Regions:
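Catalytic domains of carbohydrate-active enzymes that cleave complex glycans
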Residues: 1-128
Length: 128
């Protein structure tokens, strides 16, 4: 199970980097748009938290109702949440999600230099 979890995480990290190659598939754009709507630091933080909540925990019992498959969101939200689900106390997931939503986010994903080559390599790797 641990090996399968690591393979899944590795694949998702590659997908995160691949999606970073296009601005429409980046959490960074969503967060910047939200923050730029505020005029004070408090407003900017609140708008960022609301924007992140919309694409993560919003929807109540309909888990991941408004989910997005964006670079940054995969690496910094979905992967840690998956790891928490499989390796730690599942009861702490909601608490962790709320902490992620209310904490300022910054991009730490570096896109591939050649996304086409990376995509082909990723296809080859997953077909093994």
């Amino acid at each position: 199970a641990q090996r399968n979890l690591q393979q899944t995480v590795d694949l998702l990290m590659d997908v995160d980097r691949l999606l970073a190659s296009h601005p429409l598939y980046r959490l960074e754009e969503w967060v910047e748009l939200a923050r730029n709507s505020g005029t004070t630091l408090q407003e900017k933080d609140a708008y960022e938290a609301n924007a992140k909540r919309l694409i993560t925990s919003w929807g109540g019992i309909q888990e991941d109702y408004a989910a997005r498959f964006w670079s940054g969101l995969i690496k910094d939200y979905y992967i840690p949440r998956i790891q928490l689900y499989f390796t730690k106390d599942r009861n702490k997931i909601r608490e962790w999600e709320e902490q992620w939503i209310t904490s300022p986010w910054s991009n730490s994903t570096t896109p591939f230099d050649d996304p086409v080559e990376a995509a082909l390599s990723l296809i080859e790797k997953t077909n093994k």
